[in-house]
């Protein structure tokens, strides 16, 4: 994830530099054609270019705004996941270690149940990350395999759902009938996990309208190809002043601007992809798991 302006500038340069080089080469080619065939290859009226450029700017503005909305929604979803997982683990630590709330009598049994619930929460977070990243064949350690066996988790089904079912079943069996408030509170967190997962899967499985993206890209490319014919050459001071060559960097800058904005919109429009502009899913999930493991360490101490 890009965290500083310096990193952002470096990534921006890596994206825009190829566009600038290609635009410069294209401008040189057009200027060469003008020198060979004359000024009649340029458009005599700039009105067409102005109207077309305004339309392209509107398209790109809407595209960038929509892409950022998707990115921000994804970031809020993972912020909600962080808060829900931390709160859920904290309440497990608090509720399960209250003997009068549980069916279990032995303190060691209660601690083991709390550890298992926190471990299952960590496994759920890891599995949720794997499913969002399409990494369905992630390796499982011995502790995970043990929990899957102890809680009869069917690995042939969707694992994230199976883990939540096991969590809900364990909570239902763990608390005494009089602990309805605690049980209901924890079940609400299970429901929130389902809600968060559904929102994330909606973003992942519903990409930004590809037809609109293709149309915007084609429009931008067409406009970029037209720009040198709209700008023309700059004949201030006469043909021998060489000021006409100012049209080359001018065209390259304008073209790079439009092409870079379109590229940034495409990157931000897929917020769960593995690139530097996407939501840092791995970092967020590792932080959540670390926080949950801290609570587990309190139980062991």
Predicted segments with their positions:
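Structured inter-helical modules in multipass membrane proteins
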Residues: 91, 95-212
């Amino acid at each position: 994830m890009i965290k500083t302006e310096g990193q952002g500038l470096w990534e921006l340069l890596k994206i825009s530099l190829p566009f600038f080089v290609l635009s410069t080469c294209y401008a040189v080619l057009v200027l060469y054609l003008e020198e060979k065939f004359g000024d009649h290859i340029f458009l005599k009226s700039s009105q067409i270019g102005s109207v077309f450029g305004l339309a392209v700017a509107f398209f790109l503005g809407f595209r960038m705004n929509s892409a950022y909305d998707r990115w921000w929604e994804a970031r809020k979803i993972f912020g909600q996941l962080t808060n829900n997982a931390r709160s859920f683990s904290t309440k497990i630590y608090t509720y399960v270690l209250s003997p009068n709330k549980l069916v279990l009598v032995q303190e060691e049994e209660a601690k083991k149940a709390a550890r298992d619930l926190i471990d299952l929460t960590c496994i759920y977070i890891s599995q949720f990350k794997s499913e969002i990243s399409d990494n369905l064949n992630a390796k499982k350690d011995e502790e995970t395999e043990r929990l899957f066996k102890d809680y009869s988790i069917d690995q042939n089904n969707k694992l994230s759902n199976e883990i939540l079912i096991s969590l809900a079943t364990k909570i239902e069996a763990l608390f005494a009938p009089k602990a309805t408030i605690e049980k209901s509170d924890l079940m609400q967190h299970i429901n929130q996990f389902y809600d968060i997962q559904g929102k994330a899967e909606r973003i992942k499985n519903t990409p930004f309208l590809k037809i609109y993206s293709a149309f915007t890209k084609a429009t931008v490319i067409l406009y970029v190809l037209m720009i040198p014919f709209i700008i023309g050459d700059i004949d201030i001071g006469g043909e021998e002043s060489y000021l006409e060559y100012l049209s080359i960097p001018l065209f390259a800058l304008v073209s790079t601007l439009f092409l870079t904005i379109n590229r940034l919109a495409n990157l931000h429009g897929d917020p769960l992809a593995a690139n530097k502009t996407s939501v840092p899913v791995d970092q967020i999930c590792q932080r959540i798991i670390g926080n949950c493991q801290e609570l587990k360490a309190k139980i062991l101490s």
